[in-house]
Structures are given as structure tokens and as C-alpha cells.
Amino acid sequence: MGLAGVKKKQQIGVDPRNSKWAKDTNRLGFKLLSSYGWVNGNGLGEKQHGRIHNIKVSLKDDTLGIGAKATNDLEWSGLGEFNAIFGRLNGDESAYGVYAEKAKVQQLTYERQSANEKGLKSLELSRRFVLGGTFTSEFSEWMQKAEEDEDRVCEDASSSDEAKREKRKKHSSKKKSKKKTSTGSALDPKKLEKITKKKKKEHKKKDKESSSKKRKSGSSDKEEKKKKKIKLKDKPESTSSVEKVKEGNRPASIHFHTRRKFLAQKRAAVSDPVALREILGIKG
């Protein structure tokens, strides 16, 4: 038992997409284009931006009429395009469909611009292809701002330091100029000579005092050295030689004593079989 409905048989032809004609290289158009340097698979035009694929036939698989499927949300009749054409011819921009057409044209121009920016030839590739960009996080922006702030602070500090140095230089130059003017104007040449003579006398006195102190210290050092030499000569040589001998023999005698003790203990352990067994860990 089959379904209660009219049976429809569909007979598809041998070559529904007309590929036999498309692949035929003996056609006049194919020969003419190949004589100009065209190769199968290339597009037409200076930049070869023309269509590469052949035009295909689409089969209508339904019995619906024109305007049965909605092209827009508001238009069902399928006559909106004609209204737009008439509106453009009459110069009426408020006609139905004119705004939609303008929007389509603007969209196409925008897509072409984006394709040119991306360096792509076809609009289809520009719709699918998305250019990648560098990821800039908030942290990198914050770091840039911090570096800029540090540079500003350093510049301000350097400018303030330079200003302080300039002030100090000016102040010191003013002081020097004041001193020069005061010494040149207030003091007479006679007074200056007296001052210089006094200073020379003071220097001479100081030099004499220092030289006398050095002589006294040198004589006292010589006397102390002589006394030490006399004391060393008075001491007997015998006591010094005995002490040297004692100091030299002490470590050697201690070393030999410990060595003898160790050898005696070793001999006692080897001679006693019980002690040997205990050392080697042998039972029985």
C-alpha cells in the first residue's frame, strides 16, 4: 500500500548542467580567446577579475509562482523592484523600494572598498575573509601611560636641577664680585702689606715649633732603642737556647707517645682471638 497522493515522476536529462558544451574546446569563442593569450581557468580583464566558473543552470523544484517567496518582510507581491525603477525614472525618492535599492548600492560600494583595503580581488572573498589584528590589552596601555608619566617626572626633575645649579652659580659669582670690590676699595696698599707680613711671621713661628718637636721626638726614640739593646745584651744566652730546645721537642714527644699507645692496643687486639671475633662480627 502506498501513500494516498498523486505520483510524480521526474526525469533528469543526461547533461542537466550543460557541461558538455562548457568543456568543448573546439568552439569559436574559446579559440578566439586562446589566440589572444587567454588560458582556461583565468578570468577576463586587465587584472583577471572576471568570472572563472561557468554559468550553471538551476532547476526549479517547486510549482510556486513569482512573488510566492518573500524577498523582504513587507513585500510579498514581487513588484517592489518595478516600483523602484519607476520611482527613479520619475525622480520620486519617496516611492516604494527606492530606499532599499539605495541601501543595496551603498552596501556594494562599502564591500568593494573593504576588498580593496584587504587587497582581495573578489567581493565573495572579502565577505568571508577577516583580517587579523594585534591584540592590545589594558595592561600594555597602562604600561605606556606609566612610562610617559615617568619620562615627564624625569624631565621636570632635570629642569629643576638645572635651575638650582644656575641659581648657585649666579649666587657664587655675586659673592666673588662683592669680595673683589670690598678688598680693592676698602683696604689701602699699606694695610695689605702689613697683613701679609704678619701672616709670614706666623708661618715661620709654626715651622720652628714643628721642627723643634720633631727633633725632641727623634732624640727620645734613639735613647729608648739604646736602652733596649743594653737589656738584650745583659740576658744570658744559655736560657734562650734551653727554651728553644724545649719548644722544639714538645710536639715530637707527644706525637711519639700517642703512636706507641696506638700500636700497643693494635697488638693486644690481634693477639686476643676473642677480641678479633668481636671486631669482625664472628659468632661462636
From Swiss-Prot:
Ranges of Basic and acidic residues composition bias in the record: 207-224, 233-249
Alphabetized, the UniProt keywords read: Nucleus, Phosphoprotein, Ribosome biogenesis, rRNA processing
Q: Classify the main location.
A: nucleus
List cellular component terms (GO): nucleolus; nucleus
One example GO MF annotation: RNA binding
| Pfam short name (any one) | G-patch
This protein's source sits in the domain of life called Eukaryota
Task: List modified residues, type Phosphoserine.
Answer: S159, S160
Keyword presence, rRNA processing: yes
PROSITE patterns, per database record: G_PATCH
Per the record, where are the segments of Basic residues compositional bias? Answer: 166-181, 196-206
Domain G-patch stretches: 25-71
| Localisation per UniProt entry | Nucleus, Nucleolus
Region of interest (Disordered), ranges: 149-253
Q: Where is the signal peptide?
A: none
Q: Name one GO biological process term.
A: ribosome biogenesis
The family annotation for this protein states: Belongs to the PINX1 family.
Query: What is the stated purpose of this protein?
Result: Involved in rRNA-processing at A0, A1 and A2 sites and negatively regulates telomerase.
The protein in question is named: Protein pxr1
Instruction: Please name the source species.
Output: Schizosaccharomyces pombe (strain 972 / ATCC 24843)
Please name the gene that encodes this protein.
Answer: pxr1
